[in-house]
């Protein structure tokens, strides 16, 4: 694992964007695994700027998002589909038929999860996976548990995650209690992983995920088993290392 400690959120975002841009330039028909939330938003802004400057071209890129809320229509302003459209896809030239986000309104959830895994396999696997990390150590929506799911699955969100995500909704009661998420095995199947974190509220999770122990109660710690991981964090998130 390579660890980059940056001065602040802006520097962290720029660093991550440059690594993603390099990946796109070197493999213009590659597959990106994408994350949502407040952490990668700055990186997406940087990528949009690089696209507008003519430095990168997304026309052959394929994308797979980590997760989506279950029971939330994609047209909902708090859906991850809406997030991705507003923060990235509306501003670059990736063909929407190459964009994949789990269908949170699927009637047959098991079928949707199996189909998502198959789409990833048919695309040749994920070349670069972007991750954030929850304050409780979750990645995607893989919550702390004694037994982690390996493949895309339906997950019950913890009270901590629901509270943390309530800032994206008008009321905490509006936050979905379930989500579809890539599993730990799906994430570890990516050829390269970038995990980003900023802020003091992520410092404990960063300490726990880099201590050398693979602990299912800290799902992010599992990426220590991956041969090509880049951790990009700001000074506050690195404060307990």
Swiss-Prot record:
Gene3D superfamilies: 3.40.50.1360. InterPro entries: Glc/Gal-6P_isomerase, Glucosamine6P_isomerase, Glucosamine6P_isomerase_CS, NagB/RpiA_transferase-like. CDD domains: GlcN6P_deaminase. It is an enzyme of class 3 (hydrolase). GO terms for cellular component: cytoplasm. It catalyses: alpha-D-glucosamine 6-phosphate + H2O = beta-D-fructose 6-phosphate + NH4(+). Pfam families: Glucosamine_iso. SUPFAM superfamilies: NagB/RpiA/CoA transferase-like. Pathway: Amino-sugar metabolism; N-acetylneuraminate degradation; D-fructose 6-phosphate from N-acetylneuraminate: step 5/5. Keywords: Carbohydrate metabolism, Hydrolase. Catalyzes the reversible isomerization-deamination of glucosamine 6-phosphate (GlcN6P) to form fructose 6-phosphate (Fru6P) and ammonium ion. This is Glucosamine-6-phosphate deaminase. It comes from Alkaliphilus oremlandii (strain OhILAs) (Clostridium oremlandii (strain OhILAs)). The lineage of its organism: Bacteria, Bacillati, Bacillota, Clostridia, Peptostreptococcales. The gene is nagB.
């Amino acid at each position: 694992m390579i660890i980059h400690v940056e001065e602040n959120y802006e520097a962290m975002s720029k660093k991550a964007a440059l690594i993603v841009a390099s990946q796109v330039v070197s493999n213009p028909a590659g597959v990106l695994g994408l994350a949502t939330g407040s952490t990668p938003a700055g990186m997406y802004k940087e990528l949009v700027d690089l696209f507008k400057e003519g430095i990168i071209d997304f026309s052959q890129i394929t994308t797979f998002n980590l997760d989506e809320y279950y029971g939330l229509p994609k047209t909902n302003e708090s859906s991850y589909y809406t997030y991705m459209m507003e923060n990235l896809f509306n501003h670059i030239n990736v063909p929407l038929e190459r964009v994949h986000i789990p269908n949170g309104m699927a009637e047959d959830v098991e079928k949707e999860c199996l189909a998502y895994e198959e789409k990833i396999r048919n695309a040749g696997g994920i070349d670069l996976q972007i991750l954030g990390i929850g304050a409780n150590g979750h990645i995607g929506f893989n919550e702390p548990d004694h037994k982690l799911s390996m493949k895309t699955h339906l997950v019950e969100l913890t009270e901590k995650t629901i509270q943390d995500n309530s800032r994206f909704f008008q009321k905490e009661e509006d936050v979905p209690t379930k989500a579809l998420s890539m599993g730990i095995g799906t994430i570890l199947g990516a050829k390269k992983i970038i995990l980003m974190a900023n802020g003091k509220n992520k410092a404990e999770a960063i300490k726990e995920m880099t201590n050398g122990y693979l602990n299912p109660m800290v799902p992010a710690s599992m990426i220590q088993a991956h041969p090509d991981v880049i951790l990009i964090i700001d000074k506050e998130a690195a404060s307990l290392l």
